[in-house]
Amino acid sequence: MKSISRARPDVTIKFQSVNTRLVCSAGIEMWPRRRKEKSLIESMMAATSQSVVMAMGHGDLNECWRLDQRCFSDGEAYDRETIRYLLSHAQSVCHKVIAPGDQMIAFVVGMIEPDGTGHVVALGVAPEHRRYGHGRRLMYEVEQGFLRRGVSTVRLEVRTSNIVAQRLYLELGYKIVRRMSRYYTSGDDGFLMVKNLA
């Protein structure tokens, strides 16, 4: 085998003079400074409030595989058999975001490793649905799933060139603990990031 690396957040909008403060239950707080930022954040919150996060299982194989192919078109997408294994394994913690129309627009796959560590194996968001907070919501869900199963430490890998993902993980409390030379099949380096949940 190759190496395998539901609750909607409540949204509160509070207006204060020119700026808008937006807070959701996952702890996101934003103070936009410009009208353009305010409009972007409001549209992001509207998009996430119209989508639903739910558990994902073996029945989602084909849709998850297709979305994985779109999200990781750089050659790092998993094959169908690996996705099947991940979704059906007893130690997996998997969630998806469903948009209106029952379309899967994002997913996360976590696995509890033999040493008891939670491993975020894959986090994918459809390109046209990025920057709307779906990745943050899914990370919250997978961490909660790990906690319910007694996991206190979570790890993940991210490309050294993927600054956007690194920023998200750092904001969520992950720390870079090691650089892994030529970790990806493309030859790119990766960072190992770790977070203590307890």
Predicted feature residues:
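Short glycine/proline-centered loop/turn elements that form peptide/ligand docking sites
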Residues: 139, 162-165, 182-187
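Conserved hydrophobic/aromatic "anchor" residues
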Residues: 72, 107, 129, 168, ...
